[in-house]
Swiss-Prot record:
SMART domains: EFP, Elong-fact-P_C
Protein name, entry field: Elongation factor P
Protein family membership: Belongs to the elongation factor P family.
Subcellular location: Cytoplasm
Any GO CC annotation of this UniProt entry: cytoplasm
One biological process term in Gene Ontology: peptide biosynthetic process
InterPro entries to which the protein is assigned, alphabetical: Elong-fact-P_C, NA-bd_OB-fold, Rib_uL2_dom2, Transl_elong_fac_P/YeiP, Transl_elong_KOW-like, Transl_elong_P/YeiP_cen, Transl_elongation_fac_P, Translation_prot_SH3-like_sf
Length: 190
């Protein structure tokens, strides 16, 4: 059993005997009302999508999923093909199935993902907590600001934009925390 406040993208819960994938989860706590979790769910069997609001204390049935290591093999339009690293089986996912990690997926990446299966069917992937990506474009740094606390926008090679420290330059490798939408962690060790 899970509670409403434990929901996060990639979690699968059972509603009316169907498995539902949590694609988006936003925790909100206001002074007057109790804490709530706004979720965007996708039915893994039918593909139907819906949005449901849960209170933080709601009890939900979670689904036991199989997990395997996989790597991105190639991208064809909106279809992403992943390969199981143990038996080399290929699995396909649509872009909408991996919406939460899509900003950090790029052709040729070498990160080992965690493929999530429900009844032998690939339903989602999770990236490692920390990934390394190359900065494709960023503005020059302001003179004298080397403390690392001043942030500026940067664009990765796949088009994703995020805030990085002011001293980061084009072609620098940076570490990104993939949880909660992704954030800059620091310059990658060479």
């Amino acid at each position: 059993m899970k509670t409403g406040k434990e929901l996060k993208p990639g979690t699968v819960i059972r509603l009316e005997n169907d498995p539902w994938l949590v694609q988006k989860a936003e925790f909100t706590k206001s002074g007057r009302n109790s804490a709530i979790m706004k979720t965007k769910l996708k039915n893994l069997l039918t593909g139907y999508k819906t949005e449901i609001v849960y209170s933080a204390d709601d009890k939900l049935d979670d689904v036991i999923l199989d997990r395997k290591e996989a790597t991105l093999s190639f991208i064809s339009g909106d279809t992403y093909t992943f390969m199981d690293t143990t038996d080399y089986t290929m699995y396909e996912l649509n872009a909408e199935d991996i919406e939460a990690v899509l900003p950090f997926i790029e052709e040729g990446m070498e990160d080992v993902c965690e493929a999530i299966f429900f009844e032998e069917r690939l339903v989602s992937v999770e990236l490692p907590t920390t990934i390394v990506r190359k900065v494709a474009y960023t503005e020059g740094s302001a003179r004298g600001d080397t403390s690392g606390k001043v942030m500026k926008p940067a664009k990765l090679s796949n088009g994703t934009e995020l805030q990085v420290a002011d001293f980061i330059e084009i072609d620098d490798l940076i570490e990104i925390d993939t949880r909660e939408g992704g954030s800059y962690k620091g310059r990658a060790k060479k």
